[in-house]
Amino acid sequence: MRITLPLLSTAVGLGLTAAVLGTGPAATAAAPQEPVRAAQLGYQPSAGSGEDAAANRAFFEAVVKSVAEKRAANPSAAAAVTVYYSATNAPSFRSQISRSAQIWNSSVSNVRLAESSSGADFAYYEGNDSRGSYASTDGHGSGYIFLDYRQNQQYDSTRVTAHETGHVLGLPDHYSGPCSELMSGGGPGPSCTNPYPNSTERSRVNQLWAYGFQAALDKALEKASQR
């Protein structure tokens, strides 16, 4: 599927259809509205493209920017990089979200996920959406993950959530991968229930948050010093 890149908004993740994004998702707790032009990475393995990689980078960079700006405002904070999320608008998936955070926190060392009641770097939402589950950002530090009810019944819910969270940490989709690869998403089919990243995925996340974050932090510190 050809994906139209957005002017302002990008969506990445596990969508059951190849529909182009319109307004925000039809969630129980309405997710932020998106511009009409946006990109979606579908759940079907054939949906991948070079433009998908650009979409994923946009989401990752938005989250990194949000975290870096907070660190720049408080340089004396602990050395560990922490990405804060809100699960307030996805109460039905609270256990899966918590489990996903635990999985990633036990798998990588350069970044940690933690829930926050305010000032989160991204948020989870839930509801019914023909596009399925996906991650979206406006490219300016505001992002969210949408978890679709039907898709989370058809596929292992913890795997879906951990997969979407992988986009937050910088990983792209790789539908042709085996079940042992978390970012293969729905490629291996509904029988795949593995919610863990493999060694290559773990290594990649550690690299991204060691080098990519430092560059973003340097930029944020420079910007803060000019104020």
Curated annotation (Swiss-Prot):
It is an enzyme of class 3 (hydrolase). The keyword S-adenosyl-L-methionine does not apply. The N-terminus is blocked. Keywords: Calcium, Disulfide bond, Hydrolase, Metal-binding, Metalloprotease, Protease, Secreted, Signal, Zinc, Zymogen. InterPro entries: MetalloPept_cat_dom_sf, Peptidase_M7. The lineage of its organism: Bacteria, Bacillati, Actinomycetota, Actinomycetes, Kitasatosporales. Pfam families: Peptidase_M7 (PF02031). Residues 30-42 form a propeptide. Disulfide bonds join 179-192. Belongs to the peptidase M7 family. The active site is at 164. Zn(2+) binds at residues 163, 167, 173. NCBIfam families: snapalysin. The gene is snpA. One of its GO terms (cellular component) is extracellular region. It comes from the Bacteria. Its cofactor is Ca(2+); Zn(2+). This is Extracellular small neutral protease. It is found in: Secreted. It catalyses: Hydrolyzes proteins with a preference for Tyr or Phe in the P1' position. Has no action on amino-acid p-nitroanilides.
